[in-house]
């Protein structure tokens, strides 16, 4: 077993856990390289007749060969044995009952509903039944199809044990994982990533990985996109700097294990179903690699938020961390948006999020703290879904407290909170088990029922004959 050191040109960040040091490479979209053993990367070519130290050269392609160079993604892996050395795949038994990869109307386990939905945090079983990341993963909603290479799925997970003797591979799309409770130590073919709550990790389509739980039970959120990949959003008039900086995205350095592992299992998600194949070695046998298609993580506290500085509430798109675009300019298959600590300074302005009906669909989660638009009921580890054109906005308590504040024009710092949103142009279908879940808040609608009319003809407002003008 070997622990990598970064190449001399790499920028590194180090984290310690149990005496181990994790070294990372900096930069989203960069062409990176890493060697766990010096001299194992071929020089000047990708697939020599005989690779250094007798390794096998294997390319992992994230885009078609003919994709434009600016969007072409691939990585060369130099490994002890190639991935193809395994027994045939078979459907996993027992099958996973709560994963979906196709959301058309014929999928009997999903329904369409415009109702506002909210879920309380799911309990994580402390020991029994044992659930690793794969078994603890379940789909909440989604749209499109992994077979048609267009769409997304939103999952949640609750796990109480590390993956042992197996690795997971998602052939359907990219995973963006948001841990809310408990660190994740993720071993990938490119190396290891330690991801605590407050950070995110992206595992691109096709990578094999295993999830360990160094702090014990963990839960969180997962978005999955079909047929495209996440990228930084355009900044437009913001300029060259701001929001998420490419240099703050960190990828692993090469790490490998050379051990005999009879019965090691590869669990492959394909079309939303799970298949298994066995082999006699660990898939984490990559001694060196180079390319621009790699797993990466990001610390959300490094996000540089923008906001209005005089009046009105900015649209939430100003808080986009990553986007998965469609072929229509400005229309996202899926945006990952956060609501981090920040200053609120707008004058004569209702500062919480405004009441809204949106052509996009919004799935929200809360990592910690209290969300500014919900005084109670929306808890860390919980979730909400407001689908296309479904009304939503601040609850009654938030509205009444905001408009009656005597210091409403004073600057205030929103702190101790971190919420996020997965937003998509595609209308989701919701899994029946999510609708039937005991965690579902069936009284969610009540948080708005108390909103009352403040309109009066006697308070200097407009009359029906004279429209309100300023």
UniProtKB/Swiss-Prot annotation:
**Binding of Fe cation, residues:** 356, 362, 392
**GO MF entries:** homogentisate 1,2-dioxygenase activity; metal ion binding
Swiss-Prot/TrEMBL GO biological process terms? homogentisate catabolic process; L-phenylalanine catabolic process; tyrosine catabolic process
Q: Which pathway is this protein assigned to? A: Amino-acid degradation; L-phenylalanine degradation; acetoacetate and fumarate from L-phenylalanine: step 4/6
Keyword Oxidoreductase in record: yes
Q: Please give the catalytic activity noted in the UniProt record.
A: homogentisate + O2 = 4-maleylacetoacetate + H(+)
Query: What are its cofactors?
Result: Fe cation
Family, per entry: Belongs to the homogentisate dioxygenase family.
The protein, known as: Homogentisate 1,2-dioxygenase
Q: Identify the taxonomic lineage of the organism of origin.
A: Eukaryota, Viridiplantae, Streptophyta, Embryophyta, Tracheophyta
């Amino acid at each position: 077993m070997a622990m990598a050191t970064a190449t001399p040109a790499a920028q590194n960040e180090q984290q310690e856990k149990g005496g181990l040091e994790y070294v990372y490479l900096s930069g989203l979209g960069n062409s990176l390289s890493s060697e766990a053993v010096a001299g194992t990367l071929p020089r000047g070519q990708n697939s020599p007749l005989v690779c250094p130290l007798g390794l096998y050269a294997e390319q992992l392609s994230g885009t078609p060969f003919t994709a434009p160079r600016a969007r072409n993604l691939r990585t060369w892996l130099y490994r002890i044995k190639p991935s193809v050395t395994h027994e045939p795949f078979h459907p996993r038994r027992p099958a996973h009952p709560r994963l979906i990869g196709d959301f058309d109307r014929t999928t009997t386990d999903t329904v369409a509903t415009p109702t506002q939905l909210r879920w309380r945090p799911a309990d994580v079983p402390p020991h029994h039944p044992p659930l690793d990341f794969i078994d603890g993963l379940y789909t909440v909603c989604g749209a499109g199809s992994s077979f048609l290479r267009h769409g997304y799925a939103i999952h949640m997970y609750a796990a109480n044990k590390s993956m042992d003797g197996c690795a997971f591979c998602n052939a359907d799309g990219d995973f963006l994982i948001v841990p809310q409770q408990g660190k994740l130590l993720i071993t990938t073919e490119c190396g290891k990533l330690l991801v605590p709550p407050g950070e995110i990790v992206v595992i691109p389509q096709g990578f094999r990985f295993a999830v360990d739980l160094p702090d014990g039970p963990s839960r969180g959120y997962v978005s999955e996109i079909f047929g495209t990949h996440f990228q930084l959003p355009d900044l437009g008039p913001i300029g060259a700097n701001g929001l998420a900086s490419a240099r703050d995205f960190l990828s692993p350095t090469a790490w490998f294990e050379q051990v005999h592992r009879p019965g090691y299992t590869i669990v492959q998600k394909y079309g939303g179903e799970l298949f298994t194949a066995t082999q006699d070695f660990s898939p984490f046998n990559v001694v060196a690699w180079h390319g621009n298609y790699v797993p990466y993580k990001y610390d959300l506290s490094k996000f540089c938020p923008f906001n209005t500085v005089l009046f009105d509430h900015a649209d939430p798109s100003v808080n986009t961390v990553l986007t998965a675009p469609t072929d229509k300019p400005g229309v996202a298959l899926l945006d990952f948006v956060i609501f981090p600590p920040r200053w609120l300074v707008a004058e004569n302005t209702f500062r919480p999020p405004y009441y809204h009906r949106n052509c996009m669909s919004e799935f929200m989660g809360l990592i910690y703290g209290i969300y500014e638009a919900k005084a109670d009921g929306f808890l860390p580890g919980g979730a909400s879904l407001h689908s296309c054109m479904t009304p939503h906005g601040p609850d009654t308590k938030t509205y009444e407290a905001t408009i009656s504040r005597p210091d409403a024009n004073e600057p205030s710092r929103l702190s101790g909170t971190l919420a996020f949103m997965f937003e998509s142009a595609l209308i989701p279908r919701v899994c029946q088990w999510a609708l039937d879940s005991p965690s579902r808040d069936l009284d969610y609608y009540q948080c708005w029922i108390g909103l009352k009319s403040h309109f009066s003809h006697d308070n200097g407002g407009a009359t029906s004959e004279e429209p309100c003008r300023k």
